[in-house]
A protein has these predicted regions:
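Short low-complexity stretches enriched in small and charged residues
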Residues: 1-3, 31-34
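Inter-motif core of Ras-like GTPase G domains
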Residues: 1-19
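Class I SAM-dependent methyltransferase SAM-binding "motif I" and its flanking Rossmann-like core
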Residues: 23
Length: 111
């Protein structure tokens, strides 16, 4: 249903992915489905990306580059996992707001 909704509103897609193991497969499948439906994918956002203090995970470290390369996506945005991000309160930590503000959303939407 998301594909039908995306086609209806006519805006480029921004795919949001998780950072962990398996995300390359899930994201590439999503990109394939979107493109097969004739939709333009403008960016992939990897949400809750671990910060510097998080334990090192080689799969997480490799995911952004592999998604960009194998998914043929020019823009892969990392939004770090911050304690002040709260979905229920609809709040973002200043670091996350800064990252999101750097993306040219109007340009992506073709406005």
């Amino acid at each position: 249903w998301v594909i039908h909704f995306a086609r209806l509103i006519g805006l480029p897609l921004v795919v949001v992915a998780r950072p962990g193991l398996g995300t390359i497969n899930h994201t590439l499948l999503t990109l394939h489905a979107a493109r097969s439906a004739g939709l333009h994918v403008a960016a992939v956002v990897i949400n809750r990306y671990p910060g510097d203090a998080a334990p090192f995970d080689p799969s997480v470290a490799a995911n952004p580059a592999q998604i960009g390369l194998r998914g043929k996506v020019d823009r892969v945005v990392l939004v770090t996992d911050e304690p002040d991000n709260d979905v229920e309160e609809a709040t973002l930590a200043p670091a996350a707001e800064t990252i999101i503000a750097q993306v040219p959303w109007a340009q992506i939407a073709g406005l």
